[in-house]
Amino acid sequence: LLLVITLFTSYVIKVKDILQKSLREKHLEILAYTDNLTGLGNRQFLQRKLNILDLTREKDYAVIFIDINKLKYANDTFGHEAGDQLIQMVATAIKEAMEGNSDGFAGRNGGDEFICVAIPSSRVSSITKNIRYNLERQRNQQRPPFPVGVSIGVATYREFLAGTSDSARGIVYSSQVIKLADERMYEDKMAQRKGPGDMR
């Protein structure tokens, strides 16, 4: 009986050690793919998820490229803490807008840039609308209102199929979709600068 108890205790300890090691590894993996300031995925997380999109040949997704307007101005004028707050406000707006899109993902691409992927692409309109709405709501809650604006560009996988030289094989890479979304974000930024003056 003593031998059985000893063996069972040894087994329990071994299982516990394995579980603890697994949890530690999982925690380290989460840290490796998380942006410390925003809690969103970081660039490595985005690259990993985008690689999966390419490998699985997912064909119904949209890329939302987001850039914070005049972050450098905010840093220089109000200090880097204010700039960090601005980044966090945008990240919160993105998180809230992405709720319910369990197949999609979002992350901070670095600096003032964020990338969201909407799956299916039909969700993209509501997501971009909610990002702007969430930002406006956060801004109005600040006293005084905190100046925050973003430029947004959108591109979908499907719009490439007719124009790519590899369209017969249906080969489109996420980097192509991101590049187009980035270009459209810049167009949005230029259009905003022609409008009424604000934090653009």
Features from the language model and the residues they span:
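Interfacial "cap-and-anchor" motif at the non-cytosolic start of specific transmembrane alpha-helices
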Residues: 1-24
